[in-house]
UniProtKB/Swiss-Prot annotation:
Record flagged with keyword RNA-binding: yes
Protein name (Swiss-Prot/TrEMBL): Large ribosomal subunit protein uL6
Name of the encoding gene: rplF
Function comment: This protein binds to the 23S rRNA, and is important in its secondary structure. It is located near the subunit interface in the base of the L7/L12 stalk, and near the tRNA binding site of the peptidyltransferase center.
Keywords from the UniProt entry: Ribonucleoprotein, Ribosomal protein, RNA-binding, rRNA-binding
Signal peptide: none
HAMAP family registered for this protein in UniProt: Ribosomal_uL6_B
Stored InterPro entries: Ribosomal_uL6-like, Ribosomal_uL6-like_a/b-dom_sf, Ribosomal_uL6_a/b-dom, Ribosomal_uL6_bac-type, Ribosomal_uL6_CS
Quaternary structure note: Part of the 50S ribosomal subunit.
GO molecular function, one term: rRNA binding
């Protein structure tokens, strides 16, 4: 049995869970998220706890039990506290600002890069060189952060580019004669 899958999920106050027609939906103060449940996994909701069990003894069912439990835990955390990812812009003239719901980036190109935010994801710019991406869906928040970083990833010689706030860029030495 999966060690991750065995652990129950405690539901905090304000989080409601529904299991209907093979879909797990979690509702909370920050919104509603839903995820289809695989047929090899059984879900039980009782007394503010959510538990998962494999439908049979196959190896695939054990693996999917842990996967479903991890996805559900992320959904519960997302609708109650939310997720955020911080990005830093390092480089002369690199700036970010909000333009409505879109993010306008000046990254050394001859044009400004405008990144539209998907449904359920918000961006903040506390300073011109800092971006905070927030949302209830962990996968969407991470995907948007990766897309913004991909416009100008940190280069290995000076470290200029868009990087995660907790990312360490290892700088190379230049060639010497």
């Amino acid at each position: 049995m999966s060690r991750v899958g065995k652990a129950p999920i405690a539901l905090p106050k304000g989080a409601e869970v529904n299991v209907a027609a093979g879909v797990l939906s979690v509702k909370g103060p920050l919104g509603t998220l839903s995820q289809p449940i695989h047929s090899l996994v059984k879900v039980n909701v009782e007394n503010d706890t959510l538990t998962f069990a494999p439908a049979d003894e196959s190896r695939e069912a054990n693996a999917l039990q842990g996967t479903m439990r991890a996805l559900a835990a992320n959904m519960v955390k997302g609708v109650t506290t939310g997720f955020e990812r911080k990005l830093n812009l390092v480089g002369v003239g690199y700036r970010a600002q909000l333009q409505g719901a879109a993010l306008k980036l000046q990254l050394g190109f001859s044009h400004d890069v405008i990144h539209e935010m998907p449904e359920g994801v918000k961006a903040e710019t506390p300073t011109q060189t800092e971006i905070i991406i927030k949302g209830a869906d962990k996968q969407k928040v991470g995907q948007v952060a990766a897309e913004v970083r991909a416009y100008r990833p940190p280069e290995p010689y000076k470290g200029k580019g868009v990087r995660y706030s907790d990312e360490r860029v290892i700088l190379k030495e230049t060639k010497k004669k």
